[in-house]
């Protein structure tokens, strides 16, 4: 079973990623030209939901899935993907005012729409929120790996430290 703080961060991150998917899917639905930046953002959100939320649910109930090394790897990849997605979209929209018509008309992501501009800015914000949560979860995974080893889980290591696993001691006989 994963820690309570880890599960709370997973729930909050799930909400941020669902909001990001909604904003990005709206950008994809209203686009006139192809934008690989927006497509990558959708991939990063979908990958984050799949590996963080769904894998986290399974890791709560199936203890062999909760290896600290696997959780660290997935959290680190999610951090990298969401940071890259937020940065790619932020560079693409170049953080101008959405009321500036010359900027909105010339940008490949906003494509002449102030609404698309605001949606892209909101998607960048939620991607960075998600990125911060993935960074916190990566650090938690590192501390878990240091304390429990790369292939041990927290509950198994606690049982081993208290002497409940293996050969019984003389006081248990």
UniProtKB/Swiss-Prot annotation:
Keywords: Cell membrane, Membrane, Protein transport, Transmembrane, Transmembrane helix, Transport. The chain crosses the membrane at residues 11-30, 38-62, 76-93, 138-157. Its main location: membrane. It is found in: Cell membrane. It is a multi-pass membrane protein. Residues 31-37, 94-137 are extracellular. Residues 1-10, 63-75, 158-173 are cytoplasmic. The keyword Protein transport applies. Pfam families: MARVEL. GO terms for cellular component: cell periphery; cellular bud membrane; cytoplasm; eisosome; endoplasmic reticulum; mating projection membrane; membrane; mitochondrion. One of its GO terms (biological process) is vacuole fusion. InterPro entries: Marvel, NCE102-like. The C terminus is necessary to target MCC-specific transporters into MCC and for the formation of the plasma membrane invaginations. Belongs to the NCE102 family. Involved in membrane organization. Required for the formation of membrane compartments of CAN1 (MCCs), localization of CAN1 at the MCCs and subsequent invagination of the plasma membrane at the MCCs sites. Involved in eisosome organization and might act as a sensor of sphingolipids that regulates plasma membrane function. Involved in a novel pathway of export of proteins that lack a cleavable signal sequence. It may be an accessory subunit to an essential core component of the non-classical export machinery. This is Non-classical export protein 2. It comes from Saccharomyces cerevisiae (strain ATCC 204508 / S288c) (Baker's yeast).
């Amino acid at each position: 079973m994963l820690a309570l703080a880890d599960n709370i961060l997973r729930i909050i991150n799930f909400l941020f990623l669902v909001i990001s998917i909604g904003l990005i899917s709206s950008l994809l639905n209203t686009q006139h030209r192809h934008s690989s930046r927006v497509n990558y953002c959708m991939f990063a959100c979908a990958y984050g939901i799949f590996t963080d939320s769904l894998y986290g649910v399974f890791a709560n109930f199936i203890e062999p899935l909760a290896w600290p090394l696997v959780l660290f790897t997935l959290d680190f990849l999610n951090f990298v993907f969401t940071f890259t997605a937020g940065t790619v979209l932020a560079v693409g929209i170049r953080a101008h005012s959405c009321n500036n018509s010359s900027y909105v008309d010339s940008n490949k992501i906003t494509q002449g729409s102030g609404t698309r501009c605001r949606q892209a800015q909101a998607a960048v914000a939620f991607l960075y929120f998600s990125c911060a949560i993935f960074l916190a979860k990566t650090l938690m995974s590192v501390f878990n790996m240091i304390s429990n080893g790369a292939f041990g889980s927290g509950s198994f290591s606690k049982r081993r430290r208290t002497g409940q696993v293996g050969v019984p001691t003389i006081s248990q006989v």
